[in-house]
A protein has these predicted regions:
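Active-site region of the double-stranded beta-helix
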Residues: 79
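Surface-exposed molecular-recognition determinants
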Residues: 1-63, 69-74, 83-587
Length: 587
């Protein structure tokens, strides 16, 4: 066996992380446990477990190389690449790729005969001699993978000799390496080398093809089109103890917020504990509540001022009552609002293409399918609409999530399942406009004023997607619940199960500085902060993992939508490295 696979010394450091296996993302199909060791560079998969391990650090651009070696076992094993929407559930939806299972669009080598396999029709370069030329039968052989994400091709080799190139599917997603047991009934072990031992051949047994690099965060930073932004300059979460003083200043943000969402952590009634949303388009003292269909209200003791590093919450019971504790989630858009005429209805808009957040107001026309400019420059993946003028029956908050499509509507102020609706006139948002049916009073009542909040994915800052719950406990759920890759360390996560009545749940890393987060709030009810084991989530350096079998986040086969915003991106261009969080001993 190769010394470079078996060395006890690796170059991994906090400022330059190297690729490894990701045990939080493994697919365990049966009861026997898989195992990792040697710094997550060795995988053991028992005979009755046809399981798969993906690696960390998914790849979206650049040229990458790594090596794999068997360490005994059956000849039925797979080495290869899998899409970044890979999930721990065989039939799951994840990362917003609707209808894809974890094995769709893989390109692998079945090492029993080294024959290429792909579940993506037409994606593999045909070469009838490939299997015979690359026969692979011994654990001393080194399998080589060269992945070119710029040309979207992958090439496999053995002991320094490469076969033909394979075309990646036209799915526009990123890819990552993975290993898998080929069939039940076979026990296999795998050793991986991502070059972290250093030395000749960039740390590998065989020299990578020209231009191909080892997988580590410094190389990723150079090669991949990551976001040139600092998350804390666009999103922040702050907490404070109320004092009923209008002059009270809440600071700690690195920006002047355009949207401030305040929630009492102690109070649980609409009079004292409502979700309060303030925005710079409408100005201080004006608010709407996400847990109520009421129209916009004004209160002279509500939020007094948006400041360069925070805000003044006022002395109102719902924002700064003495003896209560509060949290505010804050976003930066584009500052001063401007008129936008991209649609056939003018909007008053503030937008940040850099952070993927905009908000705008418009006036309802009373009829017809109308378009509204949103200012993001790319398709929104989530938006919510509220009538500011009318709070009577049916003027709920309407919400769109891209994975559910234009024919589906959710309600931010309700725990219900949502359902089919023509509210968007069956028209998906575009890079410039959102279509809304003004025949619905809650979307276009003639003369009424409406507000829309829009978000889209920004690599390294925000992630909007969908996952499927595993439910139960033991192997199929609980501690082995879904892992959702974000590409950053989340500061804030909102989750809603679709298809069942369950609350919209918000968790953040400011109220819960250690894992698992066990304090959650709701958007749809003015309840006090709840704690306990039913909503455990780990906020990790590259995503989040569901730790509880509870129905609100992990119902078996449940369909869950999520939004996540970053604390720190990975890799970071600003010398900030995502770090692990302390674990609470209660979980």
């Amino acid at each position: 066996n190769s010394a470079k696979f078996d060395t006890d010394s690796k170059l991994d450091t906090p400022t330059n992380n190297w690729g490894t296996l990701n045990p939080l993302r493994r697919n365990e199909q049966n009861s026997s446990s898989t195992a990792t060791r040697n710094g997550l560079l060795y995988a053991y998969i028992p005979a009755d477990n046809q399981s798969a391990f993906p690696m960390t650090l998914p790849l979206s651009s650049g040229k990458w190389y790594w090596e794999v070696q068997a360490d005994g076992g059956n000849s039925s094993r797979y080495y290869g690449i899998t899409p970044d929407y890979y999930t721990t559930d065989n039939s799951a939806y994840t990362e917003g790729v609707v209808g894809k299972t974890w094995f769709d669009d893989n390109i692998v080598l079945n090492t029993g005969g080294m024959s290429p396999t792909s579940n993506a029709t037409g994606s593999v370069t045909e070469n009838t001699n490939y299997a015979s030329n690359m026969s692979y039968n011994t654990s001393s052989d080194v399998a080589q993978i060269a992945l070119d994400m710029d040309t979207r091709e992958v090439q496999f080799g053995k002991n320094g000799t490469f076969g033909p190139k394979f075309r990646l599917p036209a799915n526009n997603c990123g890819y990552q390496g993975y290993v898998q047991n080929g069939t039940n009934g076979s026990t296999n072990s795998f050793k991986l080398n991502f070059g972290a031992s250093g030395g000749t051949n960039q740390g590998f047994d065989y020299a990578p093809p020209t231009g191909f690099k080892p997988i580590n965060s410094k190389n990723l930073l150079t090669a991949q089109a990551t976001s040139m932004m600092q998350p804390k300059k666009f999103f922040g979460c702050v907490t404070w103890a109320g004092n009923s003083d209008n002059s009270r200043v809440v600071s700690g943000l690195q920006f002047k917020p355009d949207l401030v969402w305040i929630k009492s952590r102690n109070e649980g009634s609409s009079g004292t504990g409502a979700n309060m949303l303030f925005n710079t388009i409408r100005g201080p003292q004006k608010f709407i509540m996400s847990d109520d269909l009421n129209a916009e209200s004004t209160n002279s003791n509500a939020l007094q001022e948006f400041r360069k590093d925070g805000f003044r919450p006022g002395s109102m019971t719902r924002t700064n009552e003495s003896g209560d504790n509060y949290v505010a989630w804050c976003w930066k858009a584009g500052g001063t609002a401007v008129t936008n005429n991209d649609g056939n209805v003018a909007t008053t808009l503030t937008a940040s293409k850099q952070s993927g957040f905009s908000m705008f107001t418009y006036t309802g026309t009373g009829a017809g399918s109308k378009t509204h400019g949103h200012g993001l420059g790319k398709k929104p993946k989530f938006f919510m609409v509220k009538n500011l003028s009318d709070g009577t029956m049916n003027n709920d908050w309407s919400a769109y999530h891209f994975s559910m499509g234009a024919g589906y509507r959710a309600f931010i102020d309700e725990s219900g399942a949502g359902g089919n609706s023509a509210w968007l006139s069956s028209t998906e948002p575009t890079d410039s406009v959102i279509t809304l049916s003004h025949g619905y009073n809650e979307l276009g009542e003639s003369g009424d004023t409406f507000i829309v909040f829009c978000w889209t994915d920004i690599p390294g800052f925000s992630k909007i997607g969908r996952y499927r719950g595993k439910g139960g406990s033991g192997t199929s759920g609980g501690a082995k619940g879904p892992f959702i890759y974000c590409g950053f360390e989340p500061a804030w996560v909102m989750i809603k199960e679709m298809g069942n009545s369950n609350n919209w749940i918000i968790q953040d890393n400011t109220r819960d500085p250690s894992n698992p987060t066990d304090g959650w709030l709701y958007t749809d009810v003015p309840a006090a902060e709840e704690t306990g084991s039913g909503r455990f989530i780990d906020l990790l350096s590259d995503g989040f993992k569901i730790r509880s079998p509870g129905t609100g986040t992990n119902r078996d086969d449940g369909n869950f939508l999520y939004l996540a915003f970053a604390e720190t991106s990975i890799p970071s261009q600003f010398g900030v490295t995502p770090t692990g969080r302390a674990r609470n001993g209660s979980a």
